[in-house]
């Protein structure tokens, strides 16, 4: 019997066109996405400590985030995303998600993340997940997506300002 996945979803509105958001997401994601995931992951670790899982937090872990090529489905652009712990992998679930870019109207986009993960430790892990860890996963997902949206907005603002050389320039980097 295969373990049943848990689901989490979060979305944020971005005051940019879907094309601008999708372009920003696809622009060097290996450069800027991992840092955002690390920060969101750290926030999740702090929440784990608050709900009584301090021993888990003491395990130093980093995450690897992979963003796949986009696929268009009607007016929605979907990027497959995978988030895995690069250390302590058996203690932490991997997360598979769809990062969705959908129009909300002129110059407005819904950036959403629909995620699936299987809690570690079988049926015991599912009970623990229902008791507290699912809320930590949701908070981490929210933190990550908010950081992605902030980074895209910051890059858009930088692109609209003239650079020193007379043209507009944009560079995606991690938002604080």
Regions found by a protein language model. Name each.
Residues 6, 10, 86, 126-133:
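Residue-level detector of alpha-helix boundaries and kinks
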Residues 22, 26, 30, 64, ...:
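Generic solvent-exposed, charged/amphipathic alpha-helical segments
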Residues 118-176:
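A conserved amphipathic terminal alpha-helix motif
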